[in-house]
Amino acid sequence: MIDIKDLTMVYNGRAVLDNVNVSLSQGQIVGLLGENGSGKTTLIRILAGLERNYQGDVSICGNRPGSLTNDIVAYQPDHLPLDENLKIEEVCSVYSIFYDDFDSNKFYKLLNSFEISKELKIKECSKGMKEKIQIALTLSRKAKIYILDEPMSGIDPKSRKIVLNTIIDNFDYQGLMIISTHLVLEVEKVLDRALFLDNGKLVVNESVDDIRENHHMGVEEYFTEVL
């Protein structure tokens, strides 16, 4: 579904991505892990079609990221600017107009699972509630690939388990999901594969099962050791 060959991106004389090569097939939840400044967000923005000034080849279902992949990829940035004065149900209506593949019924089902009222205005929601709304909006698209950038950074630890269970319950294994996060311990239980970025270089690309079997440690411990 995603093929990346010799991907390099230089910004202000610094390689924020340095000769990255990786192929990702369907049926996986992939963790994109790395410290701040490692290149995670840049890679995600390239896959979302928001960054074009790079060298190398990037293919999503045979197409270069951009207008031809907008219906394939559902992208959730680390901060989604929502009109603070809109009610949640009005945001849902906007998404229904903007995305042909948006499922309003699914959105309200997810919203209910998070115990959030559709009558609330965005400005009445906490940071954690806003992130849950963003997750519900993203998962309610009928996309082939879902890319979530730090989806739980503002969610309290107790609610993270609920969010992760929601992600698992709504993941179609005919598709692909990439979760970029620094919360390695929380997400490792849902991951099939882990990618570690360090200073723009892809230093680890292994299945979670192989990490546990070959290195005799969990993803977080391995992440700490490698980086």
Residue ranges of model-derived segments:
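Conserved structural motif at the start of ABC-family nucleotide-binding domains
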Residues: 2-4, 17-19
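The feature captures the beta-strand-to-loop junction immediately N-terminal to the Walker
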Residues: 33-35
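Conserved ABC transporter NBD signature motif
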Residues: 55-69
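ABC-family P-loop ATPase nucleotide-binding domains
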Residues: 78-133
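Catalytic Walker B motif of ABC-type/P-loop ATPase nucleotide-binding domains
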Residues: 146-150, 155
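ABC ATPase "signature
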Residues: 205-206
